[in-house]
UniProtKB/Swiss-Prot annotation:
CDD domains: DHOase (cd01294). Catalyzes the reversible cyclization of carbamoyl aspartate to dihydroorotate. Zn(2+) 2 binds at residues 99, 136, 174. PROSITE patterns: DIHYDROOROTASE_1, DIHYDROOROTASE_2. This is Dihydroorotase. Its EC number is 3.5.2.3. The active site is at residue 247. The modification N6-carboxylysine is found at residue 99. It catalyses: (S)-dihydroorotate + H2O = N-carbamoyl-L-aspartate + H(+). Pathway: Pyrimidine metabolism; UMP biosynthesis via de novo pathway; (S)-dihydroorotate from bicarbonate: step 3/3. The keyword Metal-binding applies. The lineage of its organism: Bacteria, Pseudomonadati, Pseudomonadota, Alphaproteobacteria, Hyphomicrobiales. One of its GO terms (biological process) is 'de novo' UMP biosynthetic process.
Length: 346
């Protein structure tokens, strides 16, 4: 029986939702992760520092008594966002990043940015104070194929943004393509990139081959196998600009299993077990800690966690949690399509 002890990991891209779903899922992240960057795409979105403070209180109230989990709050960038409010939130220690959603790119992004020029005054302030911009990197131009939207975003939006504001610290969130990996590698230390658990495991065949599988549908959508392999190479490389952002995104099953299903994969309960499998498969268990526990804090200029966790590998496959109940309904947990042998020890 094999064990691996690492610093406690963090999740640099997490959806906890609100209300009954928040109550049902929060502990699944808190069980393994010390901190998480919390996405602000609620309805209505988390736009102001006051909104973020209130949401943080709701998250803390959803955790078990004595939980040490720390939600790291973000603001949703709109064309009417107030630079002074954002700076005040950052100076107070509450706000750790601002999230750019191109309008219509993903779940609850209708209030996002349609014209990047309109938010440059805010971006300039963020660059000045050192506040990171987390970017959902897809164009929403209907003429662009869904599988090309990340590459086109890099060309149309990210490259001009980098030229105009090279001092702005940017996180390319949930990169899904070799184009994204290569762009991140070509940039200086002001650019980092998160990679999700599921994009290391599935390609687009998982969604489309042999029938529609809605629980593998997410945005950005999984791409072809060559891109998945590029993501794996980046994640296991030890390169400091790549770090874990699970993009765990719960939706109730009826909202996934329908004619027009929601995008999102709920992987919080089994992420660390899945990642241990991936890194073991790649002969890179010695670099799992860098990806999950060291690179993200370094980019966000936070200390790594002092606490350690131990992962244990069992000879026989372990039973995996399949569903999380939310009242009379349920959320399906990500199925990696391989037997789970690793477990975070209590």
């Amino acid at each position: 029986m094999k064990t691996l002890t690492i610093r406690q990991p963090d999740d640099w891209h997490l959806h906890l939702r609100d209300g009954s779903v928040l109550q049902a899922v929060a502990e699944h992240s808190a069980a393994h992760f010390a901190r998480a960057i919390i996405m602000p795409n609620l309805v209505p979105p988390v736009v102001t520092t006051r909104d973020a403070a209130a949401y943080r209180e709701r998250i803390l109230a959803a955790l078990s008594e004595g939980s040490a989990f720390t939600p790291l709050m973000t603001l949703y960038l709109t064309e009417s966002s107030c630079a002074d409010d954002i700076e005040a939130g950052f100076r107070s220690g509450l706000i750790k990043a601002v999230k750019l959603y191109p309008a219509g790119a993903t779940t609850n992004s209708q209030s996002g940015v349609r014209n990047i020029e309109a938010v440059y005054p805010v971006l300039e302030r963020m660059a000045k104070i050192g506040l990171p911009l987390c970017v959902h990197g897809e164009v929403t131009d209907p003429a662009v194929d869904i599988f090309d939207r990340e590459a086109v975003f890099i060309e149309r939006v990210l490259q001009p943004l980098r030229r105009r504001l090279p001092e702005l610290r940017i996180v390319m969130e949930h990169v899904t393509t070799k184009d994204g990996v290569d762009f991140a590698l070509s940039q200086d230390e002001n650019v980092g990139a998160t990679i999700t658990t599921h994009h290391l495991i599935i390609n687009r065949n998982a969604i489309l081959a042999g029938g529609i599988r809605p629980h593998y549908y997410c945005l950005p959508v999984a791409k072809r196998e060559s891109h998945r392999l590029a993501l794996r190479a980046a994640a296991i490389s030890g390169e400091g600009r790549f770090f874990l952002g699970t993009d765990s995104a719960p939706h109730l099953d009826p909202l996934k299993e329908c004619a027009c299903g929601c995008a999102g994969v709920f992987n919080a309960p089994n992420t660390m077990a899945c990642l241990a499998h991936v890194f073991e498969e790649e002969g890179a268990l010695d670099r799992l800690e860098a990806f999950t526990s060291l690179n993200g804090p370094a980019f966000y200029r936070l200390p790594p966690n002092e606490k350690r966790i131990t992962l244990r590998r069992y000879d026989e496959p372990l039973e995996m949690e399949r569903k999380v109940s939310v009242g009379d309904e349920a959320i399906t947990v990500f199925d990696p399509m391989f037997p789970i042998h690793w477990k975070v020890e209590d």
